[in-house]
Amino acid sequence: MVTYRPVPEGREDDLKRLLQYSFVPERGNAPESYRLSRPPDLYDLRGLFEDGDLCSACKRYRFDASVRGQRRSIGGLGALATFPDLRRQWYARRLTRHVLEEFREEGIDLVALWPSTIDYHRKQGWGIAHEFRRYEFTPEQLRFADRPAGRYTAVTGDDWERLRGVEQGARRTLSLRRSETWWRERTLGDWAGSGDPFAFGYERDGSLRGFVVYTIERESGTTPHEAVRRLRVRQLSAVDDEGLRALLHFLGGHDSQVDTVELRRPPECRLLERVRAPETATCTVEPGPMVRLTGVDALERLPWPETLDTEFTLRVTDPLVEANDGRFRVTVSDGTPSVEPVATGGHAGDSAEDGGADAVTDIETLSQLYVGTYEVRRAEQLGNCNFEESVIEPLSEVFSEEQLALSAFF
């Protein structure tokens, strides 16, 4: 019999063996070397057990995040793994379904993950929330601005509240309000086993206006003279453009120390238009985190315009959660929404059920609309959805495109 339950502390050896094989197999068969830090307020562990044996496991997070201007609790799914001899037997799929159901029971509407294989998660209803642009510059290219009026200062875990204030000042959907433990153990700590990162802030008039967290790595070449030092930015946050320019200027000051500066920014941060000699830079577009709604009734917790009155039928397809796969009546009165399932006589997948629905979408696209990956017209072009003209205007009032940035990896 397969059961879903927390992974007890007494099973840590099994868990280390699973996670070491799944995520760092290049270290060889040495699960005892895998670091499994378990601060109680960072995550908890869930697993599928069959006849007492651990088959599949994951880390389950809870975050305080910004969603369309509201402070909300969202879930996080990380380190999803199955033993190699048990793969392709639906364990990971079943584990994911149980995690989503548990989050829904706890009142969590939205869950995020960092995908290892995007197509795999897409088949289970997850959608890419946003993209990143990864840049590689020489340090000299970042010295395009005059020296800023403020000053630079080293920051540590003791500054976590000031750092959090900077991140919240950026006002982006999916930005996390991280706990003190997260700042100390993850953002500024050696959680990956590669050493503590460096961290500096930019201050002006006594106020922290931005900060950057980074590592410096040496990459060997075929000869000692070909070795490259790379400054890799883990996180860069600023409350305004002055803070951003100041931090880029700070990174540019490493020209005598490193050969390359690598950083990742949201797509609207168009650094090629600012740096010197942009034709010599490298810029690649990469998929970011994925998101998924736990239930269609999550629409009831969105901030709908107070003057909006509308009613429409919504057809949703969900390959993983049966309760989401069907038709729903959405009613909005004076900005207060109500979502109710509509009973149908046929099979949930019958095309006849789509007849008469004002809006048809899969859970992936609905999740992207929910966080603001697309606005409605763009979703029709890029997503798997179709909207009657009568609902385009009211839906556009709630599903506007947002600036998104979930930068914390988990």
Report residues per predicted region.
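Conserved GNAT acetyl-CoA-binding A-motif
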Residues: 103-115, 256-266
